[in-house]
Amino acid sequence: MAIKKASILAQFAAIFLTLLVADVRCNDPNDKLRAVYSWKALEFTFPNEQAREAAIAVGDFIPGSPMPIDVDTYLHDGRFGRRIFVTIPRFQKGVPVTLGFVTTEVTADGNPKIAPYPNWNWQRSGDCDGLTSVWRIEIDRCGRLWVMDTGKIEERQVCPAQLLVFSMETNRLISRYRFPQSQVRESSLFVTPIVDARGHMCHDTFVYIADVSGFSLLVYDHQNLRSWRISNNLFYPYPNYGTFDIKNEVFDLMDGILGMTLSPSRPYGDRILYFHSLASKVESYVPTSVIRNYTLFADNPEAASRSFVAFKNERSTQSAAQAMDKNGVLFFGLLSELAIGCWNSVNYDYGDEFIERIAQNEDTLQFPSGIKVITSKNGRQELWVMTISFQRVMTGTMSPNETNFRIQAAVIDELVRGTKCDVASININSVRQSTHGSLTFPTE
């Protein structure tokens, strides 16, 4: 009976996902983000039940222990269709897969199974030629999956931190870069890669990486296979904002720079990197033309300190992941409000007065840890969000009887319609300007 039920659930999941990704729209105005997948606990596509039991016996898999952090998707033209990738860092024991994709297989109690990416051989704990612990990923417009592997299992640095690149068409490794030990601190944890791919063939590619507990920014130059470390006071946690209250569960966490994203290209060719610390209500920014300058930082990680600027106005609460769309609209979680916020960087100054709450739900929007703006094949932009019951992990109250992890999605045009983030409806001839510290970006 259980096998038959699981088979039916798998068929239903496949049909539902097909309908969803064909049209990620929601007809209910009070439920703008549509559920794609949800889990009470993560389960994996072990080769067979004996392999699963063996993994449990030796502690490689502790049911209920794995926790997803990030999500990204890629729509293949070939036999794979759309793949939805998830990352599962090994910051605690019992995580058999650190990078995988969601399959149509479903357990008897409704949890979609996750398959290892690219395969099981890459998931061996302690194998430094494989994947050790992946926090976040990014798929660029040239079909490359960028994977930031911290090399840490729990608090132990078992392998060098490395940045890997896989081809989405062949699922093969096309590049691996191990960061020099001189750029890694004992406390370092590289958690967020932001890919800046320029040129028709993406030959000019840089990756900006947040060191959340080393309070630094790493810059990787893919063409020249080199990296450098940048230090700035704005990368640190803000002590007054180190206490988090999510659905009346309170915990402390002094994490630094974590949420990052890039603006669209400006008319003069530059882009802006927006960033914030997790323990913070402050958003900051820096022109990428500054941080891409290797000679500027090669001998002085603290160079150009005044080029990093914090907005004078703040959010109402802390935020984790964020992403910006092609119109310059920033999307981010508002942790204590259990909401997704947006800010129109083209027409408004930064600050809570101009931040819209475009989705809010105390059950489904707890701690948005992964946010991506995805451009579909027809050019339509979609917002994809991974939410987790992170506060339950921090307070030890995680329950296997409740839904703890969710992937949700929506069409951006529908999310922002009628709000300050609806750029298309705003008078493009407005003379109003949005001022970013010492930089002024006129309304386009």
Residue spans for each PLM region:
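Beta-strand-rich domains and repeat architectures in extracellular enzymes and scaffolds
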Residues: N30-T98, W135-R136
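Beta-rich, blade/repeat-based domains predominating
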Residues: F61-G81, S125-L145, S182-V207, Y236-I272, ...
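Blade-loop segments of beta-propeller domains
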Residues: M67, V102-E154, I174-Q183
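Conserved beta-strand positions in repeat-built beta-propeller and related beta-rich domains
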Residues: R82-Q92, V147-T150, E154, D204-S213, ...
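Beta-propeller blade signature
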Residues: V97-T107, P160-R172, Y220-L225, S399-L415
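Short loop/turn segments immediately following beta-strands, especially the blade-tip
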Residues: T103-A108, E169, H222-W228, Y285-N300, ...
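Beta-propeller fold detector
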Residues: D109-W122, I174-P180, W228-T243, N293-F311, ...
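Blade-level signature of beta-propeller repeat domains, shared across WD40, Kelch, NHL, RCC1
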Residues: S369-E444
